[in-house]
Structures are given as C-alpha cells and as structure tokens.
C-alpha cells in the first residue's frame, strides 16, 4: 500500500524558520564546523543502547562521533522559537518540535557542516494527529536545499529533497511514502539516516526502509524535521542525537 504526499512550504513557515546557509567542507572526508551561536554543546552522559540482531551489532558504534547532543543543555545551539504554526524547544528531557496547523513544516539545525554522515536519533510521538512526517535532515545548505529522511506516526516512510527553491519538498519515487510494519505507530522509533556519497539510506528500528541515489547536494548541516499533512497538529520528542563519521 502506498500513498502520495507532497507538502507545500507556505511562505509564513519559510519566514518563521530560523536557518542559515553553511559553507561546509567539500573535501573527501567529513569535517566539523564550529557550532553556530555562543552556546557550547555539552558532552552527553548517556550511552546509546546496543541494537539487537546481526545488523544492529554491525552498526553499533561508540567511536567516530562527529557531534552529539542529549539535549540536557538548553544552550547547546538548537532553535528555541515560537511561531504562529508551532514551536521548537528543549523539553521533556529532549527536543520537541510541535506543529499546530495542517500542511505545515518546521525544522531545526545545530549549526554544523559535514559531508558524509550517519545520523541517529530516538523519536517519540507525544500528541496530535498521526498523518505527519518526522525525521532527520542531512546536507542542509539553506531553506531551499536539503535532504529529509522521514517516517510518519501512522507507519509510512520516505526520503525528501528540497532543491533550488522549488515550491515543494518532493519525495523520491512515484509512490510517495510507502507503508512499513517496522515503524511503531504513535510510539517510539529509533531512526538512522546515512548520507554517504550519492547514497541516502533510511533505517527505522534497525531495519533498512529505503535507499536512493542522488548527487544534487554534497555537504551541509544536519537537523530534525516535523511536518503535518492532514493532521491539525502533531508534537514529536527527539532524544539522543548522534552524528557519526561512516
């Protein structure tokens, strides 16, 4: 079962999002840029749980960490903003993005610049409708150019791209978002996004959901994203954000 979802970015949301273009590093290896703003990222004290199964053990890494944030320090550099369509802030032991109108999207970035990365984060549905999308941003250059690897709270997944100021953040593939029983509906999910070379890969709970090839964007910031489709509102908690050098 599939469904098509194309989310328009309204002008009010574009104006509301706090974003900046990062120069990045175009060398063959990932490079970390200093965080934006005056806040310093605190060293997280958590230890990520080891995933179960052969694939999980293979990908469980405690070294090669480029950036991490457990969101215990509200000055670690992520946006703390309220808009007429939602908000982004540290809360509930993590980072919460709340969207309060249908057909809208909000995201946040920590102010980094990387090329090849593997990003992991825990997601928890807190409230609102499940016709949404939530996930990880990579290679974010500005509000017009980035990738978003997302799932929905009703069990769908997809990989999206914003490129050169197009009116829509479109999905790869003709089918839009695909359904998967790997995704825990209206619950907790462990997400992973690999942006390595020209390959973009989305994982949920240790299982590969989707992989696409695209060479449009080679570097940029990472981030978190939440949007609504028909849902009147949705609220997502993110915890334990880690960026690895693949």
Predicted regions and their residues:
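Extracellular carbohydrate-recognition regions
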Residues: 48-82, 239
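Short, aromatic/His-centered strand-loop micro-motif at the edge of beta-sheets
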Residues: 166-190
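Localized edge beta-strand/strand-to-loop motifs within extracellular or lumenal beta-rich domains
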Residues: 187-201
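Beta-strand-rich interaction surfaces with strong enrichment in secreted/lumenal proteins
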Residues: 56, 104-112, 177-183, 227-228
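Ser/Thr-rich, Proline-interspersed low-complexity disordered segments
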Residues: 12-63, 246
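Flexible glycan-contacting loops in extracellular carbohydrate-active proteins
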Residues: 212-240
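Secretory/extracellular carbohydrate-interaction modules
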Residues: 99-167
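Short carbohydrate-recognition loop motifs
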Residues: 85-105
């Amino acid at each position: 079962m599939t469904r098509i979802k194309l989310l328009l970015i309204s002008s009010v949301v574009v104006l509301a999002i706090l974003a900046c273009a990062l120069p990045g590093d175009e060398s063959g290896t990932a490079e970390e840029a200093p965080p934006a703003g005056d806040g310093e990222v605190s060293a997280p004290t958590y230890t990520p749980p080891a995933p179960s199964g052969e694939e999980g053990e293979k990908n469980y890494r405690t070294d090669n960490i480029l950036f991490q944030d457990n969101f215990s320090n509200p000055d670690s550099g992520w946006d703390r903003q309220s808009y007429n369509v939602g908000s982004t802030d540290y809360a509930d032991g993590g980072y919460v993005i709340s969207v309060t109108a249908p057909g809208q999207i909000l995201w946040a970035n920590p102010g980094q610049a990387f090329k090849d990365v593997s990003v992991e984060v825990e997601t928890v549905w807190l409230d609102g409708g499940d016709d949404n999308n939530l996930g990880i941003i990579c290679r974010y250059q500005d509000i017009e150019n980035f990738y978003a690897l997302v799932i929905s709270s009703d069990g769908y997944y997809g990989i999206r791209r914003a490129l050169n100021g197009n009116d829509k953040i479109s999905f790869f593939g003709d089918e839009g978002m695909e359904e998967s029983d790997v995704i825990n509906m209206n619950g907790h999910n462990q997400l992973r996004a690999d942006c390595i070379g020209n390959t973009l890969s989305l994982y949920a709970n240790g299982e590969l959901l989707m992989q696409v090839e695209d060479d449009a964007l080679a570097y940029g910031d990472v981030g978190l994203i939440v949007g609504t489709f028909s849902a009147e509102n949705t609220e997502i908690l993110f915890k334990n954000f880690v960026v690895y050098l693949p």
